[in-house]
Curated annotation (Swiss-Prot):
Cofactors, names only: Mg(2+); Mn(2+)
Induction trigger: Up-regulated by jasmonic acid treatment.
GO biological process, one term: terpenoid biosynthetic process
Alphabetic keyword roster: Cytoplasm, Lyase, Magnesium, Metal-binding
Tissue: Expressed in stem and leaf trichomes. Detected in roots, fruits and flowers.
Main location: cytoplasm
Motif DDXXD motif, residue range(s) on this chain: 308-312
Protein name: Sesquiterpene synthase 31
Catalytic activity, reaction form: (2E,6E)-farnesyl diphosphate = viridiflorene + diphosphate
Pfam families assigned to the protein according to its UniProt record, in alphabetical order: Terpene_synth, Terpene_synth_C
Organism: Solanum lycopersicum
InterPro entries: Isoprenoid_synthase_dom_sf, Terpene_cyclase-like_1_C, Terpene_cyclase_plant_C1, Terpene_synth_N, Terpene_synth_N_sf, Terpene_synthase-like, Terpene_synthase_metal-bd, Terpenoid_cyclase/PrenylTrfase
Note on domains (UniProt): The Asp-Asp-Xaa-Xaa-Asp/Glu (DDXXD/E) motif is important for the catalytic activity, presumably through binding to Mg(2+).
Length: 555
């Protein structure tokens, strides 16, 4: 008997069991990433040239004389994805810029482009600047002056700056509306590469984009610029390709681990998305020093996907109750209580976290794995509540739904797990995160409501009534569109909380907070246009995966 058939047979006792099978599409990638052979000669050649270019770039980065020059240099280096080589230099430059005129009252630079760039970059690095700096571009009614309309680059920078807004910043709300309207109107009449930049920005704002995805895009755009810096460009291309080699090695490791588990055969009801899981981690951190962290996080995402599908797309209540209890006990001796198919994922789950403890023991950090275990137990408890609602046909009030569904968004778990492989993440950082700070709550909310919008139609088609959208419609007697608009409004509020949470002073380091910000960015990209890019990666994620993990940049 084939394994899949054997599984179905074993999961039936005296009576036919009706299971909520979701019928997920197979992996897009097959064995494509299972093996990767590093060309050491090419890698060594890249490293050698990069070291030379790095010194040249450092010198050029520090050579800016005017504020506009300094900001443009920082912006280009960051967009090209090579800023991680110059973190201290950039921090020192921005600290100097901020402290010279913290209220930005000097009128040396009154142009919209420079001020908008200054505002966005400093905010993204945690410096608070008042939106009042834009008042010089507004009329008595708070509207942006129509005389700005010919300054397309200025308006484009204003548009990008508007996405770092926090609560109560009406000027930035007006900036977003003004810049969006004028960019949409101007886009068809612009020449390349500016037309491409405007169209791209309207589709995906820089602040909410996955940095590595943005890097790949910007390298191609920057190459078209007449005033491009050839040293920067070559450095960026070589660095992208060298880092891509590391990413391919890591993906190969994750893919082989996934293949060895053989869930595709033994648990055919679940999604086969190991490649998409790894892509997710590249959004959290792409830099080379986070290699171990990426592999750990990718494996965790793949594992929680299996657990999620067990609750959501296969298990029945009596099985799930035992499964939930076994995970709370976290003891391999519990395995005999489980149905055969659950034994497979239960053992794999415990083995995975044992591996984490072994890996981290080398750095004396094995104790932090407990924080990730507790988050795993938490999400499983909430999955069980959700599964009971679905199976029993219960539709909770929206407040009850959200109190449970925030955990099942996975972001409490994934944020905690993202710190495991970060050697700079201390026990104090894990303790801070365990208390669910406001920025984490915002990120979890963002993930939940955007996921609910994107998956509503599919879940409705499967007979799922306990969805956030359905609960809101029932509670408030409104249409689907009104409910979706409300959830979108909640997402915008959450983004403002995230933006506020990275502003100084902060209780933890910028490196810790950046993981949370990047997880928010992944949601914006993965669920673009209300599509579930994880479950159905062919439209949304496939082009990004090809750009980052298949195609290298021509040197």
């Amino acid at each position: 008997m084939a394994p899949a058939a054997a599984l179905m047979s074993k999961c039936q006792e005296e009576e036919e069991i009706v299971r909520p099978v979701a019928d997920f599409s197979p992996s897009l990638w097959g064995d494509r990433f299972h093996s990767f052979s590093l060309d050491n000669q090419v890698a060594e050649k890249y490293v050698e040239e990069i070291e030379t270019l790095k010194e040249q770039t450092r010198s050029m980065l520090m050579s800016g004389k005017t504020l506009a020059e300094k900001l443009n240099l920082i912006d280009i280096v960051e967009r090209l994805g090579i800023a991680y080589h110059f973190e201290k230099q950039i921090d020192d430059m921005l600290n100097h810029i901020f402290n010279i005129d913290p209220n930005f009252e000097a009128h040396e630079y009154n142009d919209l482009c420079t001020l908008s760039l200054q505002f966005r970059i400093l905010r993204q690095h945690g410096y608070y600047i008042s939106p009042k700096i834009f008042s010089r571009f507004q009329d008595a009614n708070g509207k942006f002056k129509e005389s700005l309309c010919d300054d397309i680059r200025g308006i484009l920078n204003l548009y990008e700056a508007s996405h770092v807004r926090t609560h109560g910043e009406d000027t930035l709300e007006e900036a977003l509306a003004f810049s969006t309207a004028h960019l949409e109107s101007a886009a068809p009449h612009l020449k390349s590469p500016l037309s491409k930049q405007v169209t791209h920005a309207l589709e995906q704002s820089l602040h909410k984009s996955i940095p590595r995805v943005e890097t790949r895009y910007f390298i191609s755009i920057y190459e078209e610029e007449e005033l491009k810096n050839d040293v920067f460009l070559r450095f960026a291309k070589l660095d992208f390709n060298l880092l891509q080699m590391l990413h391919k090695q890591e993906l190969s490791e994750v893919s082989r681990w996934w293949k060895d588990l053989d869930f595709v055969t033994t648990l055919p009801y679940a999604r086969d998305r190991a490649v998409e899981c790894y892509f997710w981690t590249m959004g959290v951190y792409a830099e080379p020093q986070y290699s171990q962290a990426r592999v750990m996080l990718a494996k965790t995402i793949a594992m929680i996907s299996i657990v999620d599908d067990t609750f959501d797309a296969y298990g029945i209540v009596k099985e799930l109750e035992v499964y939930t209890d076994a995970i709370q006990r976290w003891d391999v001796s519990q395995i005999d209580r489980l149905p055969e198919y659950m034994k497979i994922s239960y053992k794999a789950l415990l083995d995975l976290y044992n591996d984490y403890e072994t890996e981290l023991s080398n750095d004396g950090r094995s104790d932090v794995v407990q924080y990730a275990k507790e988050r795993m137990k938490e999400i499983v408890r909430n999955y069980f509540v959700e599964a009971k609602w679905f199976i029993e046909g219960y539709m909770p009030p929206v407040s009850e739904y959200l109190s449970n569904a925030l955990a099942t968004s996975t972001y409490y778990l994934l944020t905690t797990t993202s710190y495991l492989g970060m050697k700079s993440a201390t026990k104090k950082d894990f303790e801070w995160l365990a208390k669910n700070p406001k920025i984490l709550e915002a990120n979890v909310t963002l993930c939940r409501v955007i996921d609910d919008i994107a998956t509503y139609e599919v879940e409705k088609g499967r007979g799922q009534i306990a969805t956030g959208i359905e609960c809101y419609m029932r509670d408030y007697g409104v249409s689907t569109q009104v409910a979706m608009d409300k959830f979108q409004e909640m997402a915008e509020t959450a983004w403002k909380d995230v933006n506020e949470g990275i502003l100084r002073p902060t209780p933890v380091s910028a490196k810790i907070l950046t993981r949370i910000l990047n997880l928010a960015r992944i949601i914006d990209v993965t669920y673009k246009h209300n599509q579930d890019g994880y479950t159905h990666p062919e439209k949304v994620l496939k082009p990004h995966i090809i750009a980052l993990l298949v195609d290298s940049i021509e040197i």
